[in-house]
């Protein structure tokens, strides 16, 4: 990206590594205009029911996403040949592609994947940019949500711990509660190889020592591909630790996303 990043690009960079910037990123995104690979009827303004042919790009895992970009320069960095594109407001793009997975600044060093559920929340009346979902686990209904500002000291200490435990692949944090009125607890989800009991015990010890106050905290194992809590955490929450990167990053062809 050039030295003259626009506001959205600047916030995207910040939000990729610091969750505190994510609410501002989402607010700015919804007010922004973006560049989308594809074609539209010549000379027509793009509205929700416009006839568009938007490109789908395939990720390394075989899943399909609709790419869109923060600027023309960003789009040009992601493609090798001349590329037709459509310029439109983000809200229009989200409304006309409901049910699809979209990827902001795909193939670039920093980007953001948007799952269908997250897009629905973003353009809903509540305008809530944080992932939230009610799930059934063991016959009980639980509400899980993204944490806007995780406890910094606890995250730092757990990251240091996990760097010393090779079986830990990724670690996540979210909030969990039984109903809308209940007080939420923090939940740490750990994806690891082999026996995880000792890892959970060590995590609990460090989390308890570094969490402000006497707030309760839950810890569980998550497995990609499983339903319930595991699905929500691995598909909707960005890891705060990842063995390959050791940070708040996931990868898309070796690039980072929120």
UniProtKB/Swiss-Prot annotation:
Native source species: Escherichia coli (strain K12)
Protein name, UniProt field: Protein SseB
Top-level taxon of the source organism: Bacteria
Matches recorded under InterPro entries: SseB_C, SseB_N
Known role: May be involved in the enhancement of serine-sensitivity.
């Amino acid at each position: 990206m050039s030295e003259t990043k626009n506001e959205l690009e600047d916030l995207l960079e910040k939000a990729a590594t610091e969750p505190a910037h994510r609410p501002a990123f989402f607010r700015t995104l919804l007010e922004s205009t973006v560049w989308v690979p594809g074609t539209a009827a010549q000379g027509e303004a793009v509205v929700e029911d416009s006839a568009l042919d938007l490109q789908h790009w395939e990720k390394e895992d075989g899943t399909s996403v609709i790419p869109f970009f923060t600027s023309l320069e960003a789009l040009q960095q992601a493609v090798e040949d001349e590329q037709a594109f459509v310029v439109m407001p983000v809200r229009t793009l989200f409304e006309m592609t409901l049910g699809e997975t979209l990827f902001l600044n795909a193939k670039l060093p920093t980007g953001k994947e948007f799952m269908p559920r997250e897009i629905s929340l973003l353009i809903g009346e509540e305008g809530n940019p944080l992932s939230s979902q009610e799930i059934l686990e063991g016959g009980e209904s639980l509400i899980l949500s993204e944490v806007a500002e995780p406890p910094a000291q606890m995250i730092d200490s757990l990251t240091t711990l996990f760097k010393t435990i090779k079986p830990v692949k990724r670690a996540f944090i979210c909030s969990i509660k039984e109903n809308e009125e209940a007080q939420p607890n923090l939940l740490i989800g750990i994806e690891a190889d082999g026996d995880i009991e000792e890892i959970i015990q060590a995590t609990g010890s460090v989390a308890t020592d570094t969490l402000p106050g006497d707030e309760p905290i839950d810890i569980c194992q998550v497995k990609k591909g499983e339903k319930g809590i595991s699905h929500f955490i691995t598909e909707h929450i960005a890891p705060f630790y990842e063995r390959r990167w050791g940070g708040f990053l996931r990868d898309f062809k070796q690039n980072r996303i929120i």
